[in-house]
């Protein structure tokens, strides 16, 4: 107990050097704790903005770094009384200031450890509850049970349920009203402009109230304030927050007036910024329509239709339109099942009864093969995406997605390969073609399905070069519907064979491992050399497609196969479904910009390495690994965490996340762009307001240690110099930049589907929940409110959203089906409940973990025996 006696000295003024190590260690620990707070709690502020693609991740980090630093430096004076008023009564440690210093150091360590663990797991936890739990463990371990404010502990336990429920109700109410009044109206953008000043006023009012009632700047006036115990204290000079408490009516009027002034200024700025985005989107739409002309049936008639290859699908709505058929989800499923069964039966019949003999087009208009890589021409892909015979169908909610049926896709590829086989057996080889038509036994025509694989694998399947048949005549350019009119006519022996639109897709899926045989010098000198090379490549692709119709092996490039050991090739080989992607380079700034998209408007997220292998990009090793110092520096910069594509990562980590991201109701694109500007303003003001409280959680214990060390007593007021506040703000900004993407991905991508309109409702609901409960006097966690509001908005998704364009007009003489619109109040399938359950459990563990770690560290530091010289 000798150590306890030494730590129980009534004052530190006599020997401050003995406790200098506590101040030094506390400074380092304060930096790490602030780093973890920035990566967790500050990330919640911009999670909905990044999740909705209103701003990219790097822009959110840059904005938060500036706003957090400014807010912590100017408004971070709240650390003065934050620790004193939360959970610990400092008056108990008036006679033992050294114990207070040791306990605060242990509290920083305990809270920091839990926050780093939560950041690693991507769990959004309350940093306020972390530091409160650490202080609770310190108070209990010190033996001063009366130092703990148990009323605050009871409020915290109740807030685990009250905060998410209240924020969910607020966010859901705002979103439902916004959806009914604006998003589902006939002219949503015009209505959004009319409601703009109301939205901005609701944002600025919460910020103004915080600025007036939580401001710790001092005024040269006197004020009286009632403190704990019923005593009234006189303060001169008086802080703005204390003056506001003493003159609540006047302070509220000032807050309203300040909010009106901010609304006028910010509304003008937001209006210009929002319509800059809208006009940019319209210009891109015009350029896209000029560069990629489509049929009139494929083009959208309104601004809500997405550009080709974009992420936005056709908007869906629960509002039925007159004269349009609105089948339900069950009817849609039955209709799609019937179409699928009919298509499979037709494919089987064609396999058993092949079509008449025809020859493949020598120009290979629908298939382009070069150096072992196959790709489909753009008109073919567009036709495949829009044709009724394509392999794409509508899901139960109406979005156009690829058919994932393994059986259907396998049979489709087998059908395409069979069609290619029947076309290729007569390809420009007149002896074989004519002999097969005459029934010559030397050239047997293998028609049966069982002999199809044998034909492809046999050496005789290759077509020998031969001179053109005398009966062949040059064909006109109009003979092939896919050939551009400007191309010259090319002679062929027979009429072009009809090739299914998915034949290029089948061949492209096997191009990485179905490398066509090299062209010999003899073949290259003959006129049929190029034609034979194209046909051999097609047969090689069909062979691999028949052997493995659904999956393609991502093996190393054939030219570099010898450089890779066989064991490594076998270990690194993976099976994946390859579809011909198209990288979209133009998109609104940080808004709905997919990583890789398809012409059928579906999405697939592929890493750069897999994409390079699947497309056979042929990038040299010098480009992959830059040798110059500038190239290495640029590559290192692009690999930083703030350039991560969290949407792609979240969708590939969990299939449920991908379903949530594609199954939500889609609103007008321009209206969403308009709300993205409002969402950025809301996130910025929330970042400034939260920076003061977040700084208090990290700087508060360190400020207490520094004040006790400088004054030598624990009863003095805790100071907070500006340089300490600046230090805390910079530390939080660095933590957000390096580790904040984990929590942003959890809340903004993996929990529910977030768009700008939804994200704005979430932020507004969370802000008003904190404001109302703070006015009542009930402490809440901003993290709990943010997550609760996110879940509440997600629950408002309709179960079966339908396309806004409907299924077409009702046929003449047919009565439209009268069916009630089904818009359920709550849709539990639109929330990732497994993830939310883990987040809720982490909220409960927060206080327990921090308290146990802090109590263990303090017990070891204060009560462990030590050697005395």
Curated annotation (Swiss-Prot):
Q: What are the TM regions of this chain, as residue ranges?
A: 19-39, 55-75, 98-118, 121-141, 155-175, 197-217, 251-271, 721-741, 760-780, 838-858
Q: Which residues lie on this side of the membrane: Extracellular?
A: 1-18, 76-97, 142-154, 218-250, 742-759, 859-869
Q: Which domain of life is it from?
A: Eukaryota
Q: What are the alphabetically sorted keywords of the record?
A: Cell membrane, Cytoplasmic vesicle, Membrane, Phosphate transport, Symport, Transmembrane, Transmembrane helix, Transport, Vacuole
Q: Which residues lie on this side of the membrane: Cytoplasmic?
A: 40-54, 119-120, 176-196, 272-720, 781-837
Q: Where is this region: Disordered?
A: 286-312, 374-401, 453-571
Swiss-Prot/TrEMBL catalytic activity? 2 Na(+)(out) + phosphate(out) = 2 Na(+)(in) + phosphate(in)
Q: Which GO terms describe its cellular component?
A: cytoplasmic vesicle membrane; plasma membrane; vacuolar membrane
Residue spans of biased composition, Basic and acidic residues class: 556-571
Q: Which GO terms describe its molecular function?
A: phosphate transmembrane transporter activity; symporter activity
The family note in this entry says: Belongs to the inorganic phosphate transporter (PiT) (TC 2.A.20) family.
The protein, known as = Sodium-dependent phosphate transporter
Which organism encodes this protein?
A: Toxoplasma gondii (strain ATCC 50861 / VEG)
Taxonomically, what lineage is the organism? Eukaryota, Sar, Alveolata, Apicomplexa, Conoidasida
